[in-house]
Every structure is written in structure tokens, then in C-alpha cells.
């Protein structure tokens, strides 16, 4: 019923959602913008700071792989339905 392919689709959709988050429009409203981040030397391993680092890492590292993976998934769905 809920197969491996569906899990991959959900993962891809969640990565896309994180990749397109706007820091000014969404994250800034809840106080999670770049300006609200910690300065140099202030290292706190709070859950909020870890989530912010994860969001920034996904947006930085996964941009081009997500473009390629999305293209492959679109072509796959067009060809095989």
C-alpha cells in the first residue's frame, strides 16, 4: 500500500519544501532569519540552531542535485505514467 516509491516521493517533496523556504517571508516571521542567528563564538547546540543549520545546508548543498532529481522524476512520470 505505502511502498518504497511513495517514500521516495514524500522525501523529495519535503526536500523541495525546505529548499524553497524564504528566510525573509517565512523564517523571519517566526524569528528564525539569518539576522536572528548566533554570532561568531556564540556556540549553542539548541534544537533551533540545529534546525536552522540543517535548512541552510539543504538550501546550499542540495540545490543542483534537487534540480537533477526533479528532472529525472518528471521524465520518469511522463514516460511511464
Swiss-Prot record:
Q: Write out the entry's keywords from A to Z.
A: Endoplasmic reticulum, ER-Golgi transport, Golgi apparatus, Membrane, Protein transport, Transmembrane, Transmembrane helix, Transport
Name the Pfam families for this protein.
Yos1
TM region positions: 1-21, 61-81
* Cell location: Endoplasmic reticulum membrane; Golgi apparatus membrane
Q: Does the keyword Transferase apply?
A: no
Q: Name one GO cellular component term.
A: COPII-coated ER to Golgi transport vesicle
Query: Among its keywords, does the record have Aminoacyl-tRNA synthetase?
Result: no
InterPro entries per the record? Yos1 (IPR013880)
| GO BP annotations listed | endoplasmic reticulum to Golgi vesicle-mediated transport; intracellular protein transport
Q: How does this chain sit within the bilayer?
A: Multi-pass membrane protein
Q: Which family does it belong to?
A: Belongs to the YOS1 family.
Its biological function? Required for protein transport between endoplasmic reticulum and Golgi apparatus.
Question: What is the annotated quaternary arrangement, including any partners?
Answer: Component of the yip1-yif1 complex, composed of at least yif1, yip1 and yos1.
The protein here is known as Protein transport protein yos1
Give the species this sequence originates from: Schizosaccharomyces pombe (strain 972 / ATCC 24843) (Fission yeast)
Traced from the root, the source organism's taxonomic lineage reads: Eukaryota, Fungi, Dikarya, Ascomycota, Taphrinomycotina
Amino acid at each position: 500500500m505505502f511502498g518504497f516509491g511513495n517514500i521516495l516521493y514524500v522525501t523529495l517533496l519535503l526536500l523541495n519544501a525546505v529548499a524553497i523556504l524564504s528566510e525573509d517571508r517565512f523564517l523571519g516571521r517566526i524569528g528564525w532569519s539569518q539576522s536572528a542567528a548566533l554570532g561568531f563564538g556564540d556556540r549553542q547546540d539548541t534544537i533551533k540552531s540545529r534546525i536552522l543549520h540543517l535548512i541552510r545546508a539543504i538550501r546550499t548543498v542540495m540545490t543542483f542535485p534537487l534540480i537533477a532529481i526533479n528532472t529525472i522524476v518528471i521524465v520518469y512520470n511522463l514516460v511511464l505514467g
